[in-house]
Every structure is written in C-alpha cells, then in structure tokens.
C-alpha cells in the first residue's frame, strides 16, 4: 500500500481550515469601495430589457453572461462536496467556474477526485484550472488535463505566503515561471490575485509573459492574511488585515484614463450583489467573479439555497 504522506495530510487539514475560516471571517464589517460608486439615473431608458445582450468574450470563448464562480477550494472530502455543489449551481445557471489550487492533487493523485467532480457536475461549463506560479510547466499541464479545463488560472498570493508559517519566501522568478507555464499549456492563461489586487505595474509586467487575461481579485472580500493570521498561535499579523487595493481601485488604475492596459481584465474580490457586478462592468471589467458570497450561502442555506 502507498505510504502515508504527512505533508499531504497537513495540506489537506489546511484546506479544510481555510474553508472554515473563510466562512467565519467573510465580510467581517469591512467597508466596500464599490459603495463609493453611484450610477446616474436616467428616467427615459430608451430600451427594453429583451434587447439587452449580456454576453461577453473571455479567453476567446463566448459567455452568455459576464459572471463566474471564482476559485475556492478542493482536494479533501469536505471540499469535494463544496466543489460538487458549486459546479452543479454553475451548470444550472450557465456560468463559468474556477476550481481552487490543485497543488494538493498534483502531489497526491488520490485527491484529484475533489477537483474532477467540477467537470462531472458541469460538463458543458467553461471551467478554469488553478495552480500557483511555483509549479513546473508539466504540472500545470496535468492540472488542466485533470479537470478538462478550458483555461488555467495562475494565482498570485505573495502576501498570504508571508503570513503563512509554512509559506514561500522567495518570489524573484515568478514572472519567468508564469511565462514558462503559459508557453506549455494549450489553453488560455488568466493570472489572478487571491484578494489583494493587481496594480497597473503588475499587469503591465504580466503583458510580457504571454498570458491571455488578468483577474484583479482586489481587497474587500475573503482576506487570506486574516485567515492565515487566525492559524498562527499568537495572531501577530493582525495589523496587515485589509492589505491591498480594492477591486474598484484596481479597475480604475488599469482601465481608466486614455491608456488602458493591454490585457483583458476580469474583476473579483468583495463582490457582494448584482449591483457590484454592474459597477465592476461599468469600470471596464470583461466579466466579474465571486467566491466568498457563494461559499457562505452554500454553508448556511445548502445546495438548494445556492441554486436560488
């Protein structure tokens, strides 16, 4: 029989702990920059709702609606059930869905089922695989193949890694690694933050790596610094809670003014309701994602509540 993998067990426990903390800490009395944005009301709209076309193009694919369920979790029994319910809801609603980091399944193939369930529950959905920039290109290829993904997310989480006791400390070659992954996989690559935002400078640097789009994933939603700090015995990084740029600020910096960045920009991070979705679209996002809101709804209201 296969010997036990202590590191794999630790990663699995961390996955489940992240899930519990993400639900408990979600939206902890945090102000939202979206509330600083208001629309001008026009009393003569001049259009009927049936004439509104909400479709968009992301990574060369047409989406009926500019919305997606963003990356969260996977790789354990508990998180597999979450992924199954999220994917089922995505299939019912006809929206795209991204899985959480697949590192655990790439190291331990027995955990791959927690991710494959997404494609099984959403066979016709646009599905995004998910890896970090530290993986070898061949591992990224395996991640895409694992769930028959239509695109690959590469998540950037330097702030989280620094607070995580077992996290990475060397980020010098991330851009080069992203370029190598983008060249190796045969699907479009979307580089995303995990909740701290992408600056214009970062997006400009990513333009040179060959990726197809970015997801600014700004501050205001799930805060992985707060989550990792809760895992520390002394909770000694609480002063960093709230770090990063808001999604609204990221969009304004990237797309406002006369010279928008050269990559398509997706938006996520702190998206609470349909009005926030429209606000992000008005700021230029090609599509808008949410994760924490759906996770909390699933935990509190079950799969039926999520579908509603």
Residue ranges and their predicted role:
Residues 72-74, 102-104, 130-134, 155-159, ...:
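Active-site beta-loop-alpha junctions enriched in small/polar residues
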Residues 91, 144-145, 207, 281:
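Non-catalytic positions within long, well-ordered alpha-helices that form the structural scaffold/packing
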Residues 58-105:
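Active-site cofactor/substrate anionic-group-binding motifs, chiefly glycine-
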Residues 1-59, 63:
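An N-cap/entry alpha-helix motif that binds or orients negatively charged groups
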Residues 172-307:
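Glycine-rich phosphate/ribose-binding loops and adjacent secondary-structure elements
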Residues 79-87, 135-145, 198-201, 273-274:
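Short, acidic/polar
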Residues 120-139:
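A glycine-rich helix N-cap at a beta->alpha junction
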Residues 67-70, 95-100, 127-131, 150, ...:
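Hydrophobic faces of well-ordered beta-strands that scaffold small-molecule active sites
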């Amino acid at each position: 029989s296969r010997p036990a993998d202590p590191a794999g067990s630790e990663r699995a426990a961390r996955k489940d702990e992240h899930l519990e903390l993400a639900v408990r800490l979600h939206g902890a009395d945090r102000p939202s920059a979206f509330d600083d944005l208001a629309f001008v009301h026009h009393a003569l709209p001049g259009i009927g709702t049936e004439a509104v076309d909400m479709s968009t193009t992301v990574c060369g694919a047409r989406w009926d609606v500019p919305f997606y369920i963003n990356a969260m979790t996977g790789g354990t029994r508990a998180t597999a059930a979450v992924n199954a319910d999220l994917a089922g809801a995505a299939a019912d609603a006809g929206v795209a869905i991204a899985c959480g980091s697949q590192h655990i399944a790439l190291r331990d193939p027995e955990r791959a089922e927690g991710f494959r369930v997404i494609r099984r529950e959403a066979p016709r959905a646009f599905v995004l695989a998910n890896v970090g920039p530290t993986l070898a290109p061949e591992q990224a290829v395996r991640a895409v193949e694992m769930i028959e993904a239509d695109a690959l997310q590469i998540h950037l989480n330097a702030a989280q890694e620094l607070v995580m006791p077992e996290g990475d400390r060397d980020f010098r070659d991330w851009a080069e690694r992203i370029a190598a992954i983008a060249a190796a996989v045969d699907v479009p690559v979307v580089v995303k933050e995990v909740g701290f935002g992408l600056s214009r400078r970062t997006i400009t640097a990513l333009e040179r790596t060959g990726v197809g789009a970015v997801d600014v994933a700004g501050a205001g939603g799930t805060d992985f610094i707060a989550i990792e700090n809760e895992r520390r015995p002394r909770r000694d990084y609480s002063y960093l809670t709230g770090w990063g740029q808001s999604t609204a600020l990221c969009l304004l910096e990237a797309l406002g003014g006369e010279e928008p960045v050269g990559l398509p920009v997706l938006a996520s991070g702190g998206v609470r309701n349909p009005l926030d979705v429209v606000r992000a679209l008005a700021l230029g996002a090609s599509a808008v994602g949410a994760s924490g809101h759906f996770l909390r709804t699933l935990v509190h209201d079950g799969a039926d509540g999520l579908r509603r």
